């Protein structure tokens, strides 16, 4: 197992054990309000409450997602077709999967702390952590090669290695820029809806860019030769053998 997978497994065990302990320990349980706040809107206001006796499944959603990621980390490379293998960027793949687990661990801690107070005052910490994640992800986004599991996977990036690489270079700059500026914006008190607008822009621009770039290269006849070759049909194979 890789170092990042070990980190993910250890974090998952610790977060799961910590969550269960917080719920069942008499002292911590006594501090939980009843009902417990389990969802907050974009303004940090609680908009969903759950009876204390029924809140444990909500608390375990994060650890369950972390456990699923630990299972998928070694499984997805095995499932990948040879042409879209993650092996050429395996270290980056392991890093990204581990980074997502770390994000879930951080969010779990913030959510547990926020559950002890109805005002959801820690919402800025939650959003700020997401922006830091975007910046760290953007730092390696340009190193991800064509695959089916992570990155900007549009029909045009998957169809052309050139489009994939150029799109991910652009996405890397956008993610780092939005991640850093968004984290700073949260700290100085910019409204959260403005911060989230940056995430939407960073997610949509690479999609439209990949379409534009593919069509431009196609029009100019500059698509990779390997991208232009179509798989042979059964009929053509049979005729070629005769």
Language-model segments: which ranges?
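Select subsegments of transmembrane alpha-helices in polytopic membrane proteins
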Residues: 4-11, 58-63, 69-71, 93-103, ...
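Hydrophobic core of alpha-helical transmembrane segments in multi-pass integral membrane proteins
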Residues: 8-23, 63-75, 105-108, 133-135, ...
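Active-site and channel-lining beta-strand-loop segments
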Residues: 22-57, 150-159
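Membrane-water interface of transmembrane alpha-helices
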Residues: 28, 66-80, 136-152, 210-220
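Cytosolic, membrane-interface loops and tails of multi-pass inner-membrane proteins
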Residues: 40, 44, 80-85, 147-162, ...
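Alpha-helical transmembrane segments
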Residues: 48-67, 120-137
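Ordered, amphipathic secondary-structure segments that act as subunit-interaction surfaces
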Residues: 71-122
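Alpha-helical transmembrane segments and their membrane-interface junctions
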Residues: 105-121, 177-194
